[in-house]
Amino acid sequence: MKALVLAGGSGTRLRPITHTSAKQLVAVANKPVLFYGLEAIAAAGITDVGLIVGDTAGEVPRAVGDGAKFGLDITYIEQSRPLGLAHAVLIAHTYLGDDDFVMYLGDNFIVGGIDDLVRTFRDGRRPAARILLTHVSDPSGFGVAELDDDGRVVGLEEKPRHPKSDLALVGVYFFTPAIHEAVRAIEPSWRGELEITHAIQHLIDNGADIQSMVIEGYWKDTGNVADMLEVNRTVLEDLEPRIEGTVDEHTVVIGRVVVGEGARVTNSRIMGPAIIGAGPEISDSYIGPFTSVGDNCRITGSEMEFSIMLAESAITGVRRIEGSLIGRNVQVTQSLHAPNAHRFVLGDHSKVEIQS
């Protein structure tokens, strides 16, 4: 069994961050979202991975390499334009061959991994495809499944205006080689994309057995800032505390906190769960719960909580930042007057002056 991991796409809902960075490489708890998926695939015993890249064809390979650090053998497959999930399967046919495979969207996050899902697909009576579903409050932004009274999949719609159920497709799919004929048979949707929902519907219409499983655990598509912050919160809730850097005697550390190698924290208060990467300098500051501070950041005389601060950025003299995603190489500095809190989405290399 192989894996096909999708790490292309433009990430419009995470702009301006994604103007200069692949959405799958935005870090939660100081680890790129994509890495969680690759680790889950490796933990499930799959070693051969085809990684779809598009505009990310330079950045993703630099971050992931050949896959050896994950215990994987990665082959990169370039998708010239984001033409749909089924198009990704179409261009990966040569790589996938006649193997069963799991397709994993690289910006999705699932608590608990996919070990059991892979095992039951391998060992059971294999359907042509198995899809994962979850109940959502607003299914109109997702692929949506319609089930019969016995739980069989009878229909799929892609981002319907009037959904027939609240069961959204989770970004993990299991396929046999039957899917290859289906992706060749369908036409582009009104969006100009080959939709995987249409390919699965083609299988249904031709009598194939399509199984579903409703997952009850935590799942998020990290396509927007709010969901990225929630995934960061979820990961930090299971943080194993450790102090590898330097914390002076005037600093108070409470709860589950990680201070990375080479970090220096002076005269500050760190309230977990929170993670500080390798090399930051934090002084005279408050770092509150559910905050991730990336490598080589600087925070001076500031307060921040429930936020993600990516590597190489600096915050100076800011009274309070919360619910924010701050890109790489960003500078946030004090100005004259500050409100009680600030909320940002800052792209890489931004510079913001704040009144205090």
UniProtKB/Swiss-Prot annotation:
Task: Please list the GO biological process terms of this entry.
Answer: antibiotic biosynthetic process
Single Gene Ontology MF annotation:
metal ion binding
Record has Zinc as a keyword: no
- Binding of Mg(2+), residues: D107, D221
Q: Which domain of life is it from?
A: Bacteria
Enzyme Commission number(s) = 2.7.7.24
Q: Pathway, according to UniProt?
A: Antibiotic biosynthesis
Q: What keywords sit in the KW lines?
A: Antibiotic biosynthesis, Magnesium, Metal-binding, Nucleotidyltransferase, Transferase
Cofactor(s) the protein requires to work: Mg(2+)
Q: Which Pfam families match?
A: NTP_transferase
Q: Which InterPro entries match?
A: G1P_thy_trans_l, NTP_transferase_dom, Nucleotide-diphossugar_trans
Enzyme class comes to transferase
Cofactor note (record): Binds 1 Mg(2+) ion per subunit.
Q: Which reaction equations make up its catalytic activity?
A: dTTP + alpha-D-glucose 1-phosphate + H(+) = dTDP-alpha-D-glucose + diphosphate
Tell me which family the UniProt entry assigns to this protein.
Answer: Belongs to the glucose-1-phosphate thymidylyltransferase family.
Q: What is this protein called?
A: Glucose-1-phosphate thymidylyltransferase
